[in-house]
A protein has these predicted regions:
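Short acidic/polar inter-strand loop motif in beta-rich domains
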Residues: 2-9
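Hydrophobic helix-coil surface modules that form long, contiguous segments used
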Residues: 32-43, 49-182
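Short edge-strand/loop segments of extracellular domains
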Residues: 13-34, 82-84
């Protein structure tokens, strides 16, 4: 899979190069799909074209993605190796976010994202890597986002009898709008 520059063709998946030379990746619809049979239209075998959608069955995903160690990442499902990929401070903030039902908790602040971006540009291509592992059950698709430049916040939300995490990841250019409305 060749990751496209989504600023050229406006695809919903791809990378964007920021003014400082760093990239942000938002990756979806990147793996082969099985055709779906519908009793209304028969076999749905159209490939994805731009803004169209697939007819996808529900499935389970267990995905490991290796990225530069200074990147943060989130994806469909649950991060199952959080303690391996989060710093101690990120873990403390995450634990606080799981109890914060009234306001988002910053997992990665703007200052931290900007410092990571500056270090990434100064140090060139990183050699250290981290593997993030996500599991998702009964979902139609899997996607992920990663960058060293992302600000990251989380907040617990009660849906029925379950607590889930509402998550926002965005580059510093998204502020103050995203931080105010996340």
């Amino acid at each position: 899979y060749n990751v496209p520059d989504h600023t050229i063709d406006r695809a919903r998946s791809g990378y964007e190069v920021y003014d400082d030379g760093n990239k942000g990746f938002v990756i979806a619809q990147f793996y082969p799909r099985m055709a779906v049979y519908s009793d209304v239209e028969g076999w749905q075998n159209s490939q994805f074209w731009g803004r169209d959608e697939f007819a996808l069955p529900f499935g389970d995903f267990d995905v490991s993605i290796t990225v530069p160690a200074d990147h943060i990442m989130d994806a469909t499902g649950v991060l199952v190796n959080r303690k391996e990929v989060f710093s101690k401070e990120m873990m403390r903030r995450f634990e606080r976010a799981t109890q914060s039902f009234d306001a988002p908790v910053m997992i990665v602040t703007q200052a931290e994202a900007e410092a990571a971006a500056a270090n990434g540009v100064a140090n060139g291509i990183p050699t250290a890597k981290k593997t993030w592992r996500f599991k998702a059950e009964m979902v139609r698709d899997f996607g992920f986002a990663t960058s060293r430049r992302f600000i990251w916040d989380m907040m617990a939300v009660k849906i029925g009898n379950r607590d889930v995490m509402a998550v926002s990841m965005y580059p510093p250019e998204g502020n103050p709008l995203w931080e105010d409305w996340s």
